[in-house]
């Protein structure tokens, strides 16, 4: 048989000697052989878990090798020789001393472990030895706190195997385990693999701590480099595990202060804390703490009993993969009003089951509008949270309303990934997730909620004087959760809501997927089914969705100048900008809208420097002052107020309320280049010929008929006073009723002819009026008798008013005496041979059946 590897058993000998010390009061005083004793040692070591299976297998190979190769006698002779020479006893003592480096059992120092005997002295002696302390199977009762000095290791035979508890006689005020220098602290403490039973039952079912951190199961003060692994804390009068600063009383020194002697570099893992008096695991005024893979559940009392509480002044704390169940708060990050809040806290993976408020972040005393703003409540980041069936069936905190998440008074809270699920919708009827009480700069992303069909709001940013603000909500999926999916209260100025998908077909009386009181949230990507309204903003319903953006907006633009928070640049290049409120540039290059309510579109190298100004489809143009428009023009400038430049080049428009057009110059705007103008008083000016676009060539005016009836086209008319009738033989002809007048005067198209006061010659009476702030113009003076409420019809719409062609080529009715080249006279309004005008053309010969023909006559 090949010789096994023996070097791996070098330390085994030391462990054997410890067992010899326990089993053999003196060497070889038992009847068993040496090999039997060695195998007994292996059996014992295997029972207490000191050897792994592969080590035992190797030892069996050693035994087989010794026996099969006939070395048994040699080994016995050698050991007996050592004993006779006194070497064996020395070896035993030496190995025992070395073995103690691996730990000493409290039973070695007299601990009984029957749950009745006071074992405190055994614990104190074992700890005082300076060696690692081992707690074997048993229930070890103590009559006072177990105090832990620096550089202490205490391990047990495992949770629920090794149990430490208080005797019933211990009064209120002691913690079961506490570091011995709780004023200024200890260091290098390692605790693992046992149960702490606070035996709170000795005080009755409603027992609570006597004050400060007293009466906790494990209390660590002002210490550093502390490892707490696989500890179960049950029946705590106060906290299961309490990490705090120096002193038994918590310090209340005011917000913005730092308590002296913090605990730091604390590592808590794989612990369990049921039947709490207050919190399962709590931290206070300490830093650099990790808590992982812990389970805190089922508190005894109905106060603010939290699974894990990161409390007053704690900072730089990391929680990972923990569980809470049936507590008031699953994880509470908080502070009282006169201390700093916990800050810079990371929660990465937590499952809250049946807690009232799965995640509760708050700084008490800083919630109302009149409270001082928190100086310290900042920085909480959460990833991959779960909330299962939040409820308050037990009536915690006077029946406080359940929440999945509540954020109050904290600045800088980020939640990335939160799954909330309930099969009991009636347990949460208000708001599931709330951002409230002056919380600011909160980001909620990756939220999935299912089953909260009776909740008024799935997510609610509460408004009013103490509401939240500066909140980003994105990537939200709601499955029958919330009559309102995302609701935003009043007075909240900075909210962004994006990518919300909701199904509400299982909700009684759903309202809207997104509902906001104010009109200025940013909203995009909202969709769903089962809700009557997709978005409701400031009371206005949008049933097909809505996209709202606040702040400077730039889209499809390669580069830009400054953009105002209420401006935009779209589809533009070459440093276009919108530098004023309510300004914009669209599809343009190198253009800047510099004034409020100004727009540049489809243009290049243009500038608006006045409000209410617009430039469209133009090049190298500028507007100043107020209300000007330039369209399809180049190298032009509109100043003054309410002026328009159309289809022009090199035009400078000034004054007020004018429409201008023209062309000229070499790119420098000038009024001399104006070719057409129309003023606010209706004055039209043209620099060149005004022509008609048809062949009509007479000039006409409106005249009222004597009998108030219309006179048919082509009849010659004469005056009777200021009115007209058909001209008779020998009467002076003033013209003919015309349908071909190129110019027509006197229609009074838009207003009653007496609307404005006139002088004795019929001219308008003017007065100076301030038409815009600081802008004065002469305007016709209103007639006091004018009533604008009366309906008005222009003369062209009234039958008594007829257009009379006075001058030009006019079509008239003729009899059979009229000849081309001769003049005419009138007979019952029909032209007959005479000496007025000249007949140019007979266009329709006379027909006796009709009683007239038609001729074109030139009248002067």
UniProtKB/Swiss-Prot annotation:
Active site: 701
Localization of this protein: Virion
Gene name, Swiss-Prot/TrEMBL: 12
Subunit structure of this chain's protein: Homotrimer. Each appendage is a homotrimer of gp12*.
Single GO cellular component term: virus tail, fiber
Record comment regarding domains: The N-terminus has three domains that function to attach the appendages to the phage, digest the cell wall teichoic acids, and bind irreversibly to the host. The C-terminus is an autochaperone that aids trimerization.
InterPro entries: PbH1 (IPR006626), Pectin_lyas_fold (IPR012334), Pectin_lyase_fold/virulence (IPR011050), Peptidase_G2 (IPR021865), RHGA/B-epi-like_pectate_lyase (IPR024535)
Main location: virion
Key words, A-Z: ATP-binding, Degradation of host cell envelope components during virus entry, Host-virus interaction, Late protein, Magnesium, Metal-binding, Nucleotide-binding, Repeat, Viral attachment to host adhesion receptor, Viral attachment to host cell, Viral tail fiber protein, Viral tail protein, Virion, Virus entry into host cell
Entry keyword Repeat: yes
UniProt entry tagged with the keyword Transferase: no
Top-level taxon of origin: Viruses
Any one GO BP annotation for this protein: symbiont entry into host cell via disruption of host cell envelope
Protein name (record): Pre-neck appendage protein
Gene3D superfamilies, alphabetized: Head decoration protein D, Insect antifreeze protein, Single-stranded right-handed beta-helix, Pectin lyase-like, succinate dehydrogenase protein domain
Manner of cofactor binding, per the entry note: Binds 1 zinc ion per subunit.
Purpose of the protein: Structural component of the 12 appendages that hang from the lower collar. Adhesion protein that binds to the host cell surface during virus attachment and mediates teichoic acids degradation.
One Pfam family, short name: Peptidase_G2
Binding site for Mg(2+): 309, 311
Feature type site, description Cleavage: 697-698
Cofactor(s) the protein requires to work: Mg(2+)
PTM field: Autocleaved to produce the 74 kDa gp12* assembly attached to the phage particles. Autocleavage of the C-terminus is a posttrimerization event that is followed by an ATP-dependent release.
